[in-house]
Regions:
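Local cysteine-cluster metal-coordination motifs and their immediate loop/turn environment
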Residues: 11-24
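Short active-site neighborhood of thiol/selenol oxidoreductases, capturing the structured segment around
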Residues: 6-10
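Short amphipathic alpha-helical interaction segments
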Residues: 342-357
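C-terminal scaffold of the Radical SAM
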Residues: 2-5, 24-53, 58-342
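Short, amphipathic alpha-helical interaction segments positioned at domain boundaries
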Residues: 393-410
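A short, conserved structural fragment
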Residues: 356-382
Length: 410
């Protein structure tokens, strides 16, 4: 498992959204600069430690998320420059919110090698934006898309369905408006109410604020139809892209590649060999024992505390199968054959059969022009037939059931 992806977390926001349970902090403007300066100095030091240890040598994708990284302004530009000094990623994404994405920042990011900006648009209905605590309006969101494109950067838009007050008509207007702005990539997420968030507490008092799952499914269907008609193909459960503009960083997550996390709440995943090689970067973390993979989450600003999860080879195989189900291509036959080395073949074939019975997945031959004839899941798992297990439309809408079938094999 080569370490090919780097995630950097910037946990600062001008105002925390009502639905958000991510690690992010909002400050009065008088305190924000000092907090950002302190945090970024710690990021720089940690980055240098990674670089000197050779941890960044094979990095191909970088993703700076948050929080609101664009709130950091010139500090974000300097961070990107320093990352580029240690590695040469082919894709470099920074998240941004419309209110803090200026033409000057977009141009500066492009100059230091950022290739892509992911904008938190969410909706183009101003009443819906207010309901979820966003501080930009629809015009500012559309302006930000144009600003990023004018700087020569790819732009992705995040959208949400099931928002308070959202209707089928307002959802279609949002999709139409985004398509007119023509980003390169669109992600569509159903709103979930996380316990402890302001919106969760509001919904406890007013049930009308709770997302309607049937409405969300209808919204996802409309999005798939309109985005598909406009040339965006669904390559992952929540994401659509124009050809050649898929998010390589997210694909690295879903295809079992190693990744590093930098910053508070950032997660990394290392195989046994890479963990042993880089263990000195994680003070206080005990040896892995016989773990096949190690997942680490930084729990403080200065990288002295980590949450650690050890995965056995069987757990890692089950996770790879589950994550592959997020991709439109589904689970490749090679992955199934490898998984059968550590998961009993009859259990693995039974999980595939159950996905077929529930209408969540279908077999798709991997060799064009070759008609395999009748075959069973056991044939694929044994390597006698080359076919991938691809999610159906129902599997796409009801992905959690499909994911659980394979994670339960751990």
């Amino acid at each position: 498992m080569a370490v090919t992806a780097l995630y950097v977390h910037v946990p600062f926001c001008a105002q925390k959204c009502r639905y958000c349970d991510f690690d992010s902090r909002s400050f009065a403007s008088c305190d924000l600069d000092a907090a950002l300066d302190s945090y970024f100095e710690q990021l720089y030091a940690r980055l240098d430690a990674f670089g000197k240890a050779g941890a960044l040598d094979q990095i191909r994708t970088v993703y700076v998320g948050g929080g609101t990284p664009s709130l950091a302004g010139e500090r974000l530009v300097e961070l990107a420059r320093r990352i580029r000094a240690w590695c040469a990623p082919v894709e470099f994404t920074c998240e941004a919110n419309p209110e803090s994405m200026t033409a000057e920042l977009a141009a500066a990011l492009a100059k230091v090698g950022v290739t892509r900006v992911s904008l938190g648009v969410q909706t183009l209905d101003n009443a819906e934006l207010t309901a979820i605590g966003r501080i930009h309006d629809a015009d500012r969101a559309l302006s930000a898309i144009a600003t990023v494109k004018n700087a020569g950067l790819d732009v992705s838009c995040d959208l949400m369905c099931g928002l308070p007050g959202q209707t089928a008509a307002s959802w279609k207007r949002t999709l139409d408006g985004v398509l007119t702005a023509a980003p390169h990539h669109v992600s569509v997420y159903p709103l979930t109410l996380e316990e402890g968030t302001p919106l969760y507490r509001m919904a406890c008092r007013d049930e009308s604020l709770e997302p309607d799952e049937d409405f969300q499914a209808a919204c996802m269907d409309v999005a798939r139809e309109l985005l598909g008609a406009a040339g965006y193909h669904p390559y992952e459960v929540a994401s659509y892209a124009l050809d050649g503009h898929e998010c390589a960083h997210n694909i690295a997550y879903w295809t079992g590649r190693g990744y590093l996390g930098l910053g508070r709440s950032a997660a990394g995943m290392l195989d046994a060999e890479d963990f042993d090689r880089l263990a000195g970067l994680f003070p206080g973390v005990s040896p892995r024992g016989d773990a096949y993979r190690v997942r680490l989450v930084q729990r403080d600003d200065d990288a002295t505390a980590f949450e650690v999860e050890h995965l056995s080879q069987r757990e890692a195989a089950a996770e790879d199968l589950m994550l592959a189900c997020r991709m439109t291509r589904g689970v490749a036959s090679d992955l199934l054959v490898r998984a059968a080395r550590v998961i009993p073949a009859d259990e693995l074939a039974a999980a595939c059969d159950r996905a077929l019975e529930l209408g969540l997945a279908t077999w798709v031959p991997e060799t064009l022009g070759v008609h395999e004839g009748p075959f069973t899941s056991a044939d694929v798992v044994a390597g006698h037939v080359r076919a991938r297990l691809a999610p159906t439309h129902l599997g796409w809408l009801d992905g959690n059931v499909l994911f659980e079938l394979f994670w339960d094999l751990a």
